[in-house]
Amino acid sequence: SKLYANLYKELMVSFPVMSDICIQNFNSFSALFDNIRYVSEENYDEFCIVNKENSKRRAISSFFVHLMKEGVIEASKIGNIIVNLCDKFIEYISKEGMKNQVDEICENLFILIKNGIETIETDGSLDDVHDQITSFVENVITFKTKDYKSFTSKTLFKFMDLEEFC
């Protein structure tokens, strides 16, 4: 994604329409997290489609965070997406039957935070956002899976891995 982001930035210089396309796609990025689906392996064809959707969502997260690092997307916009996903995560962990959605949000948070927290931290105007993100990660690693209906050990360990980047 880093290579693609670099290439895309160069294409934007030669083809200004690429900038408009980037903005349109970025503006619809948050909506990708409104319809996270889960299908059991029993329906294999649909299961494969959902896995592709998840892979695409993660690739787009990586692409946009690398565009931020290239200066194409403002750090505040990625910061806002991270904060919104943190809120969605907290909302979902208390609901029954949301383990897969929580895991998918966690995977994307991992990508966005791991690759973007340094850029957010160096932007002096985003101290509050940086503090909010790091506090969120520090809090999540204290959670107990038994206290939340849709919080798995897999998600907890992913956040423990993420702590080293915050």
Predicted regions and their residues:
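Alpha-helical interaction scaffolds
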Residues: 1-166
